[in-house]
């Protein structure tokens, strides 16, 4: 007997997918636009509706593009610290930051640069790195799976809003259950999330699953 092609381990893509191309292409096309109409998007729905799978597919699309830097963050860790660490250690960027004399040694994120005072504030460090990325005509996509309304998430999303206001090339794609997204956007400093598009994934249609089974077996 063949294995179930739709079985899904946590965070892992299944062998077979039910296409939701319209929603995925909408996000991809908007983020890639020269003047994107939005830079934050949330994918929501009940458990098992395919949120993580869609996030993974979009993630793979952008990773294949040279002018995109894709960073995956966990909502259970210090998001700003993780974001800074991922940027500073990104293979194609570490030398760029070194040449730009961005000294991150005080924060434990890079080597000492002789003759350059180290940056002592994490947010300042991230801003400096993003400014350099912008000059290189690259964009940064941050993905967060299963967003929750905790302190580190509130701090990071609040700062992300500032980066967007500063016209820095940052994009945020999050998944989350209805109740978690609702709680997050109702924070006093995060009401801008109300204006961010939300793609609601409904439970998979039985007919779609049946047709997919027919095409496989």
Map each language-model feature to its residues.
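Conserved NTP-binding/hydrolysis module of P-loop NTPases
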Residues: 67, 78-109, 114
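A short, basic N-terminal segment
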Residues: 1-41, 89
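Conserved small helical "lid"/interfacial subdomain of P-loop NTPases
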Residues: 201-217
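Walker A/P-loop nucleotide-binding motif
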Residues: 36-57
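Conserved nucleotide-binding/hydrolysis micro-motifs of P-loop NTPases
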Residues: 48, 76-79, 149, 177-182, ...
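Conserved Walker B catalytic segment
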Residues: 115-180, 186-189
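A short helix-turn-beta junction within AAA+ P-loop NTPase domains corresponding to the substrate/partner-engaging
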Residues: 186-203
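Conserved catalytic segments around the Walker B and adjacent sensor/switch elements
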Residues: 41-42, 56, 60-78
């Amino acid at each position: 007997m063949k294995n179930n092609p739709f079985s899904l381990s946590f965070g892992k893509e299944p062998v077979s997918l039910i296409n939701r191309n319209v929603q995925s292409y909408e996000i991809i096309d908007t983020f890639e636009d020269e003047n994107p109409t939005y830079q934050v998007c949330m994918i929501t729905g009940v458990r098992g509706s395919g949120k993580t799978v869609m996030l993974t597919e979009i993630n793979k699309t952008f990773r294949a593009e040279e002018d995109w830097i894709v960073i995956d963050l966990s909502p259970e860790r210090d998001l700003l610290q993780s974001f800074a660490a991922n940027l500073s250690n990104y293979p194609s960027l570490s030398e760029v930051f070194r040449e730009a004399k961005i000294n991150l040694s005080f924060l434990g994120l890079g080597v000492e640069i002789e003759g350059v005072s180290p940056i002592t504030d994490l947010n300042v460090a991230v801003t400096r790195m993003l400014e350099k990325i912008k000059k290189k005509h690259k964009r940064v996509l941050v993905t967060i799976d299963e967003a929750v309304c905790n302190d580190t998430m509130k701090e990071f999303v609040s700062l992300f809003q500032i980066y967007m206001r500063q016209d820095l090339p940052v994009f945020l794609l999050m998944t989350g259950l209805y109740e978690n997204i609702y709680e997050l956007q109702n924070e006093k400093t995060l009401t801008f999330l109300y204006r961010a598009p939300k793609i609601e994934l409904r439970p998979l249609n039985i007919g779609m699953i049946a047709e997919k089974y027919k095409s496989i077996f």
